[in-house]
Structure formats: structure tokens, C-alpha cells
């Protein structure tokens, strides 16, 4: 299990992953997430410094964000977001009951396979009949870590009785070759959003999934 000390070491410098600079990705993410969180009570898992809380969840009625890093939570709280509150905790240890939507954006791939299974069991048990939103890279493994694959996510959803509502591409994977680089550049054109939805899996870096937990 990754520890608070591990993540505090990442957060020695603000925004270590450049999340606050990913405005194009965030716009794509908000197009997916927005209709599901407007006026809702949201539990945000792995909220980090609150960048996505501010850019994605501003239309939610309330947001409760948890992160394992005290440094990240201090910075998130300092944002002063009117609809959000933040707390330091391992999100595997908090209650999932009482929220309309649970969102795990760019965080679940930090869990080990066993921890991911434990998470989905807990989600299915404590969030029955409600909405779950997941986003992350679907490129498999690279030199840094093991991420998701589209097939792996769908298998996990099926195994834990989550019904897929929709999935949408968020951006292109430039390292997938010349064609992917061209595709990524094309996304900046006026009709780029239409092209984004047509990219094959091998050209996609991050994807967002919306599902409903079984009653």
C-alpha cells in the first residue's frame, strides 16, 4: 500500500503531475462528468490538491474530497472552494454511503491489484444504485507504472456488477507513434471533439467511464 509519506514526497513541489495545466483534458472531462454531478453530493477520492475539484465539480451541490497526503489536503483546503471540504485519509478506509456520486479521477491506478479489488467490493457494497465515475490512462504498462486497459476496466465493472452508462476518450496518446501524434494535433482543430470520440484504443491516453452500481 502506498503511504502518506510516499505522496508527501511527491508533493514537495506543488502540482507534481501538472494536473493544473491540463486544461484541454479537463474540458473534455467536464463534458462527460458535468451532467452527472450538477446539484449532487459528490465523494471525490484521491482529490490531491483540489485542481480537479475546482475545474470539474464546481456545479456539484457539495464535494467531500479525501487524499492520503496531508500536504495535498492543506493546499486543497487553501483554495477556499465554497462547495467543497477536504480531509486527510486513505480513501479505502472512509465510508462511501450517503453520496449521489463517487468519483475516482486519475487515482485508482496507484492501488495494487488486490487493493483495486477491495475498492470495487467496497464500492458495490456501500454505493448500491448510485453513480460511479472513473478516469485514467488506458495504455497498460509503461516505464513508470501499470495503468488500466479498457478491457481490464470493463472486466472489473462486470465482476462487481457495475452497469456501464458511457465511456468517452479524453485525449490522445502521443507516444503511440506518428499517427497518434497527428491525431493529437488534429484534436486542436474546430471539429477536434468529434475526432476525439473516434480514436481507436491504441491512440487513446485517458478515458472516462460512468457506471451505475447495482442495487
Short names for language-model regions:
Residues 1-37, 43-95, 111-118, 122, ...:
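Class I (Rossmann-like) S-adenosyl-L-methionine-dependent methyltransferase catalytic domain
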Residues 103:
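A conserved beta-strand element that flanks and buttresses the S-adenosyl-L-methionine
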Residues 106-107:
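Short catalytic micro-motifs in class I SAM-dependent methyltransferases
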Amino acid at each position: 500500500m502506498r503511504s502518506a509519506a510516499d505522496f508527501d514526497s511527491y508533493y514537495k513541489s506543488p502540482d507534481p503531475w501538472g494536473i493544473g495545466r491540463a486544461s484541454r483534458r479537463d474540458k473534455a472531462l467536464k463534458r462527460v462528468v458535468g451532467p452527472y454531478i450538477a446539484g449532487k453530493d459528490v465523494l471525490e477520492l484521491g482529490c490531491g490538491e483540489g485542481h480537479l475539484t475546482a475545474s470539474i465539480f464546481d456545479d456539484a451541490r457539495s464535494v467531500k474530497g479525501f487524499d492520503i497526503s496531508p500536504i495535498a489536503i492543506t493546499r486543497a483546503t487553501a483554495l477556499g472552494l465554497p462547495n467543497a471540504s477536504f480531509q486527510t485519509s486513505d480513501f479505502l478506509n472512509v465510508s462511501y454511503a450517503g453520496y449521489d456520486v463517487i468519483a475516482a479521477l486519475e487515482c485508482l491506478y496507484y492501488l495494487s491489484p488486490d487493493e483495486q479489488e477491495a475498492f470495487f467490493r467496497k464500492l458495490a457494497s456501500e454505493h448500491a444504485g448510485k453513480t460511479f465515475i472513473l478516469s485514467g490512462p488506458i495504455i497498460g504498462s509503461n516505464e513508470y507504472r501499470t495503468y488500466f486497459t479498457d478491457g481490464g476496466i470493463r472486466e472489473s465493472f462486470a465482476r462487481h456488477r457495475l452497469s456501464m452508462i458511457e465511456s468517452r476518450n479524453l485525449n490522445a496518446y502521443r507516444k503511440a507513434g506518428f499517427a497518434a501524434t497527428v491525431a493529437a494535433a488534429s484534436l486542436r482543430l474546430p471539429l477536434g471533439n468529434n475526432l476525439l470520440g473516434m480514436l481507436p484504443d491504441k491512440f487513446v491516453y485517458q478515458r472516462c467511464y460512468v457506471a451505475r452500481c447495482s442495487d
